[in-house]
Regions:
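Compact, glycine-rich, soluble single-domain proteins
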Residues: 23-154
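Bacterial N-terminal signal peptides
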Residues: 7-20
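Positively charged n-region of N-terminal signal peptides that target proteins for export
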Residues: 1-4
């Protein structure tokens, strides 16, 4: 009976373990990022997506994204890029950032689960995804400066 209970407990643990990552990002993986806008400096805690595998998954399958957190996709060099919202359940603001840390373009309030491509509108080094409404609420706009170690203009 004891062995049976241990097996059931182990199986249950494996089932609920992935749920812990469905919401907020793991604090051990978060890095600070700042955006200086006309309304002030805004600090975010971001998870890095630097490998092709991390970038392909992105924020897919997550059911929530807390305010002040996000995911930073680092392409390691400037390039035009496009994103979609396939398997992404929360609406996002996508912030397209040049290598010098300047915001090139923002796609606000993207539609969850949409397979419509959202273009960077030019070459970018990175894309920051945050919860929809963040840019409007904080007054973040194209031309604002992002500070993080991956950007040359830090």
């Amino acid at each position: 009976m004891r062995r049976f209970l241990l097996v059931v407990l182990a199986a249950f643990s494996l089932l609920i373990l992935p749920l812990g990552h469905a919401g907020s990002l793991d604090a051990a993986e978060l890095q600070p990022l700042e955006i200086a806008s006309k309304s002030g400096v805004h600090v975010f805690a971001v998870e890095m997506a630097s490998t092709p595998e991390e970038q392909a998954k992105g924020l897919m399958f997550r059911r929530q994204l807390p305010e002040g957190q996000g995911m930073l996709f680092d392409f390691h060099q400037e390039q035009p890029t496009s994103f979609w919202m396939k398997n992404t359940y929360v609406p996002l603001d996508m912030i397209f950032i040049r290598a010098d840390g300047r915001i090139l373009r923002i796609a606000e309030n993207t539609v969850p689960l949409s397979e419509t491509l959202v273009s960077s509108g030019g070459p970018v080094r990175a894309v920051l995804e945050v919860i929809a409404g963040t840019c409007k609420k904080l007054g973040i706009a194209a031309g604002d400066r992002v500070t993080h170690p991956i950007f040359s203009g830090r």
